């Protein structure tokens, strides 16, 4: 009897209370997951750092006015002179992509600018959206009533959905808004358009530029973002306008900072524009829409 009791005692001590290994296993899995994320972040930084250094060096060079005037005011030899477009009254209209102008009193290589550049490059590297792949159905917010929706809620059947990401303090975005409005007017019969207001490109308490048409600080709340979006809405084209969430979920999913253009059709990304400011080309969007219109109606569209 004593031997049996001792045997039962040893077995009981070895088993331990049920579920004792559960918290330890969960903690181990969590630690492993965080370690993998840290390794991924470190690897991405190593990949991005040379690109970031190149951009930083270019910004430093552009702070020399003689270099800035030479590079920003010359026309690339591969880009021919744009066609002159006339409106119904025979008046010449501005080009789709007016040249990027930077005033002489603006410094480009600052701590705030480098932070913004790094933020944009990191979002672009980790974005989920890629041309030919599925369109991320990220969350957006309506400016009236703060109702939460999804980007693909604005897609209707097989009609293309054009996404235009940007903010009021982004000079290229605002300078090309009239060209975007012309595309909305021309193609809205067959195509849907959605403007997504994201975090400010040049907030008054961040990377400041005198070329920005508005003085708007960083958004501290959704109410701040709504107020900024209403400024854009007053002069925005006749298409839907929504806000990115304060977690910047749509900007992150689409790598949209500073500004960017996309076309979605049947849940697939058919066109992915370059990241602004250099890659933000309304003329590329026009070309895509002209080709789509030609395929849809079988006639070559006429520019107006």
Curated annotation (Swiss-Prot):
Q: Name one GO cellular component term.
A: endosome membrane
> Which N-terminal stretch is annotated as signal sequence?
none
> What are its GO biological-process terms?
apoptotic process; brown fat cell proliferation; hormone biosynthetic process; positive regulation of multicellular organism growth; response to hypoxia; retinal cone cell apoptotic process; retinal cone cell development; thyroid hormone catabolic process
Stretches that traverse the bilayer: 45-67
User: InterPro entries attached here?
Assistant: Iodothyronine_deiodinase (IPR000643), Iodothyronine_deiodinase_AS (IPR008261), Iodothyronine_deiodinase_I/III (IPR027252), Thioredoxin-like_sf (IPR036249)
Q: Which family does it belong to?
A: Belongs to the iodothyronine deiodinase family.
**Record function comment:** Plays a crucial role in the metabolism of thyroid hormones (TH) and has specific roles in TH activation and inactivation by deiodination. Catalyzes the deiodination of L-thyroxine (T4) to 3,3',5'-triiodothyronine (rT3), 3,5,3'-triiodothyronine (T3) to 3,3'-diiodothyronine (3,3'-T2), 3,5-diiodothyronine (3,5-T2) to 3-monoiodothyronine (3-T1), rT3 to 3',5'-diiodothyronine (3',5'-T2) and 3,3'-T2 to 3'-monoiodothyronine (3'-T1) via inner-ring deiodination (IRD). Catalyzes the deiodination of 3-T1 to L-thyronine (T0) via outer-ring deiodination (ORD).
Identification of the protein by name = Thyroxine 5-deiodinase
